[in-house]
Amino acid sequence: MLRIAKEALTFDDVLLVPAHSTVLPNTAELGTQLTATIRLNIPMLSAAMDTVTESRLAIALAQEGGLGFIHKNMSIERQAEEVSRVKKHESGVVTEPQTVTPTTTLRQVKELTARNGFAGYPVVTEDYELVGIITGRDVRFVTDLDQPVTAVMTPKERLVTVKEGETREVVLQKMHEKRVEKVLVVDDSFHLRGMITVKDFQKAERKPNACKDEHGRLRVGAAVGAGAGNEERIDALVAAGVDVLLIDSSHGHSEGVLQRIRETRAKYPNLQIVGGNVATGAGAKALADAGVSAVKVGIGPGSICTTRIVTGVGVPQITAIADAVEALEGTGIPVIADGGIRFSGDIAKAIAAGASCVMVGSMLAGTEESPGEIELYQGRSFKSYRGMGSLGAMSKGSSDRYFQTDNAADKLVPEGIEGRVAYKGLLKEIVHQQMGGLRSCMGLTGCGTINELRTKAEFVRISGAGIQESHVHDVTITKESPNYRMM
């Protein structure tokens, strides 16, 4: 006798029902929780894939209000550096600015500038008392580079400083009065406590919706595997300031993954941890019991994933999301819908099924900010996109995600493919279109917030003819729409 657990549905099997509405799309509130303590301003995450998310895309997505997860197909040092780049891009108050001592030479300052990409360094004593600042203007025309910074620095008496906790308005006023671009933060004993730059204020004004931590820095996540030897990687990422750690596996409901989560939670009680992937309520509950802050749902729905075909295992995504949400009811642990998102309507459906946010890969893989070069093929521009279960990605380091770390390169059993996606331009344009579609959904269903969409919206199940009717039909498309691409 066949052991059929249940019937399961995915995105194209359902539509949302329109309802009486007082909500205008432009008034819909898109903020949502990634975890209990991390709030997103849009419900979008980027996948931890080596053709999707490195620091450049993570910065761009965080500026739009989402959050990117840096992939792990790189050395520990490089992944930590990628995280650090995001955290330093927009700093608000730089709580630990790089400093020099009074004995540092101008030559050393020039070397630091070449290495770090910025030229301003506070000068402090051994006990961190502030004695001056050295900037690019101070050393620009100096020929004797062997003299100490004290010879040309702006001394303590002429420094522009503010006390800890000073308001943004006061800081900006001081910058304007003194015509400076950097203000140093000091305590009552004139010990250095941080630095504020005008560039960070300008960035904040341009991107008011950015997803930031309590220090005004952009938020970023990073992925690690569940196998042995990842302790050092986790330590390095935490030291680099990662906001949320993704313990990533193709099968999150396995004891090795659960044990890795327990160990990480024991070592870092306050670290935000996402666990995945699962496709059942039991899997979601097991991750919650192990100590995760959010659960990632999706086995095999991704465009480049062949897990369901190679293994015969998976659960269609709408049912998988709904089952996970039901199992986690009352725990306060959000669900992330990972994979299968092709259109903005799919984002809306995933959230209406109960997810707090979605993780996308192919949607962002062709953007300007994604890793990789633009390729020309038959007169069109493309970027490469591959699954982390593809042979190429597994040989670069993601084989542990599929429990194949001990396999030789010629013995790997892939669960993904390598391909290309059309070049899509800047990430912000993609986000604008996707969030615009989501806002329209919220207007049609009468849901003013993401939480209302999660709990109020109703589905109807549709037939194959229903989805055919939903798509463009009986016409030849002559001009492609930015939010409706069939490939």
Curated annotation (Swiss-Prot):
One of its GO terms (molecular function) is IMP dehydrogenase activity. Pathway: Purine metabolism; XMP biosynthesis via de novo pathway; XMP from IMP: step 1/1. One of its GO terms (biological process) is GTP biosynthetic process. Keywords: CBS domain, GMP biosynthesis, Metal-binding, NAD, Oxidoreductase, Potassium, Purine biosynthesis, Repeat. CDD domains: CBS_pair_IMPDH (cd04601), IMPDH (cd00381). NAD(+) binds at D248, S249, S250, G298, I299, G300. Mycophenolic acid (MPA) is a non-competitive inhibitor that prevents formation of the closed enzyme conformation by binding to the same site as the amobile flap. In contrast, mizoribine monophosphate (MZP) is a competitive inhibitor that induces the closed conformation. MPA is a potent inhibitor of mammalian IMPDHs but a poor inhibitor of the bacterial enzymes. MZP is a more potent inhibitor of bacterial IMPDH. It catalyses: IMP + NAD(+) + H2O = XMP + NADH + H(+). Its EC number is 1.1.1.205. Its cofactor is K(+). Gene3D superfamilies: Aldolase class I (3.20.20.70). InterPro entries: Aldolase_TIM, CBS_dom, CBS_dom_sf, IMP_DH, IMP_DH/GMP_Rdtase_CS, IMP_DH_GMPRt. PROSITE patterns: CBS, IMP_DH_GMP_RED. IMP binds at S303, D338, G339, G340, G361, S362, Y385, R386, G387, M388, G389, E415. Coiled coil: none annotated. It comes from the Bacteria. Homotetramer. Catalyzes the conversion of inosine 5'-phosphate (IMP) to xanthosine 5'-phosphate (XMP), the first committed and rate-limiting step in the de novo synthesis of guanine nucleotides, and therefore plays an important role in the regulation of cell growth. Belongs to the IMPDH/GMPR family. This is Inosine-5'-monophosphate dehydrogenase. It comes from Yersinia pestis.
